């Protein structure tokens, strides 16, 4: 029995008296048919119209009509109960409860006991006089005594309870008639609960006792009566009633004794326990009594020894309660005698405790075996048995038993004890850790502490797959040793995870060894800041020569020159001047400010022991000093030492690019990209390299990678204007290298008859040096390829059809149609300069003659931010262009030339659309036996539309529609009135 059984709470429930007054109508739901009203058909025929009229008037709150009609009907059939109820309901509906009450009381005289009338009468509220003082209560009682009724007795009693005048309420029950009525019984119940609430325990006891004498006390009330006596601490009354045979059930004895214990009435309780020997009906009741004896008797051991146990199951309790005292006092003989009173197969646990206390190892082992056989799943029994086996020098059997029972599922504390014991036994008997047993022992257990224990077992501690299975969840509860084991296993396969494990171990057990492990691992994963911080935690005394150079190397990688130099000074003091790494680090002190000194140190390092790092560092200086051949040589030497070093391959690829060896550059950059797949600069360079080599599929492949990389960055943070421009440039590159065919249409249509103008300011446009009212040209070009005649050139073939208005001044360019087919060559990679040879043939057979034209054209100042290409950033951009064009007609020996300079502003109006106001000046020349020339200027505006873009291709098509006003400043044979002209311009690039 537990101590908290003394805290039994005794509760009482109070009875709340409420009056439920009906708010429904006085009349039942009677109906209006003859049968429901109890009328003959004739009488119903006569009365129904007036009844219907009355009901409608009542519904419409027409009091006069409703009451008049209902009263008339009642006069006609005064004994009819349903119609009387309708009239009473009407009275109540219009607030005449007194008239309704008189009507119903009169009708009850005619029909005594009618339930319908009584219900309706009872539903009428009765005004209850408010009683708020004792004087008013006594006056009410006096009035009721003069003319007693059940109602007034009940009201006086309830008012007395409310005013806590229990004697007055009790006096009402002296009226036998009232006491026997339902109202009287209610008052008695309320009085009892009120007495309990006010803790007038004697009053409550009297009422319960009266009920017992009247044989009206229920079992629940009897239990409540006992609780009242306990709550009021009416001990003498309880003893008196028990002496009369009341409250003599076993539970009452236990409850009263428990209450005495709770109140601290020790002397009274001891006397009560001695004087009373209840007859219990269950072993649990007897065990509770035994607990009280063992806890509160003057001599608990003697009390229990003298007690005659009624239930056999409680004998062990008696022994269990007395045995610890005997053992504590060292009375082992007495304890054994006490146990001898029980059968040999009982109280094995206690017998085991005695054998352990008396150091009887053989008996303890025998009992441990018996206990284990009874409860083989009980870890405590396994603990006892294996311990006793070890005490009896039977460790092999203990180990076998533990291995059989592994894993130890159950109590965590006992499980940990068994695990520690098994680990100790396996250390002593390693041959027991067979592969099969190790496989079982390495299966992860549910608790982190258990898995940590598993990881240190023989056969597992050095087994990385098993360690990863056990500790791979990285529980924060693992100790430093566990994290170290995990770090060693991840060191080669997952170096970043290994660093995390080393850091966890360092947090739990800071030491020079742990700091060193973190430093080396952090350097391996290129977390130089963490590596440097770890090295700085180690004193110079604890650092080896190798550690000093490694620390200086880490400081160099972390960009901390001061820390590097401090460690280098210590290395110099230790005489490490003949170490190649020392001179490589020493060289870093002079980079980039003193390259000559750095070169000397790097050369010294290479002479001591060639290393890839030294060669790469020296190559970097050579490249900065534009000694590209020396840089290439050193980088090739570095690759011989580290053939698979992706960074060195990339550096050599860049150097070969600088030297102009584009093909060799690609051979280095491609394997470098495999090793550094996420290096964006390397991917960009590969796109440029393959463009130079005219490898369209490869160029587009790397351009797509660049675009995807920029798009991925946009998912994280918004793109900068520079990134946005780069994305567009590579989309343009992707589109440009894939282009083979280009179709273009250019036309200018003069709006004024007789006026001449020119719109020749595009490569391959109208013939240079000539002016027309209108001009039109349609051209198709096919790119043959790059690097055809020179490295970086572009060769194309084209064919065009063009016409003008001739000299007759028609508006549309339909005169002098010619066709031209030629070869166009762009010799320079980075300049817009074309040389073309074209065979021209007339198409109408009348005007013009076939001829061969040699043509050179160029465009300047129209690149980058000043180009007419779409700009992805900003709301608009400034553009300019200087166009030069010259032609030689071989057969006719005619020369023509044009120079045009244009400035314009592109204002974005939508995505892929601009409005472009522009101005330009132009000089034209034409020599055919004589020289002709013209200087003109023009202003205009164009609507440019780019279209056809895809995710990877920038706008491949452009349409321009414009209008231009042009003025000729100087011309030969042109009248002043013809020097001004306006014309429409159309340009399509597809």
Swiss-Prot record:
It is found in: Cell outer membrane. Residues 1-27 form the signal peptide. It comes from the Bacteria. The keyword Cytoplasm does not apply. GO terms for cellular component: cell outer membrane. Keywords: Cell outer membrane, Membrane, Repeat, Signal, TPR repeat. GO terms for biological process: receptor-mediated virion attachment to host cell; secretion by cell. TPR repeats lie at residues 81-114, 612-645, 646-679. InterPro entries: NfrA_C, TPR-like_helical_dom_sf, TPR_rpt, Ycf3. (Microbial infection) Allows N4 phage attachment by binding to the viral non-contractile sheath protein. (Microbial infection) Interacts with N4 phage non-contractile sheath protein; this interaction is essential for viral adsorption to the host. PANTHER family: TETRATRICOPEPTIDE REPEAT PROTEIN 6, UDP-N-ACETYLGLUCOSAMINE--PEPTIDE N-ACETYLGLUCOSAMINYLTRANSFERASE SPINDLY-RELATED. This is Bacteriophage adsorption protein A. It comes from Escherichia coli (strain K12). The lineage of its organism: Bacteria, Pseudomonadati, Pseudomonadota, Gammaproteobacteria, Enterobacterales. The gene is nfrA.
